[in-house]
Amino acid sequence: MDLKKLSGSELLIELEKLNCDLAIPWKIEDEKLSKTFKFKNFMQAFAFMTQSALYAEKKNHHPEWFNIYNKVVIQLTTHDVAGISFKDFDLAKKMESFIPHF
């Protein structure tokens, strides 16, 4: 995977691909790929974070996130390129793949 900061047009293309089938879209906020997930309860939110953390550790690409009861707020950025890269979109896609399990 090419590690580079995505250009404005690349961001729009990747964001459109990521969001094409999602009821609640990801957004670009403060130069980060962002989304808030809402679950039925804290246990589901924490289980989602655990699955996501295991994948993030495997890829050595860690999210900025926080949890408040049943909500998980996520911001993805690649510090090595000072912006959003394909690694952020890969992690976002993987996180979305965990959602049907909840």
Swiss-Prot record:
<dbReference type="GO" id="GO:0006729">
    <property type="term" value="P:tetrahydrobiopterin biosynthetic process"/>
</dbReference>
<keyword id="KW-0456">Lyase</keyword>
<dbReference type="GO" id="GO:0008124">
    <property type="term" value="F:4-alpha-hydroxytetrahydrobiopterin dehydratase activity"/>
</dbReference>
<dbReference type="InterPro" id="IPR001533">
    <property type="entry name" value="Pterin_deHydtase"/>
</dbReference>
<protein>
    <recommendedName>
        <fullName>Putative pterin-4-alpha-carbinolamine dehydratase</fullName>
        <ecNumber>4.2.1.96</ecNumber>
    </recommendedName>
</protein>
<comment type="similarity">
    <text>Belongs to the pterin-4-alpha-carbinolamine dehydratase family.</text>
</comment>
<dbReference type="InterPro" id="IPR036428">
    <property type="entry name" value="PCD_sf"/>
</dbReference>
<dbReference type="Pfam" id="PF01329">
    <property type="entry name" value="Pterin_4a"/>
</dbReference>
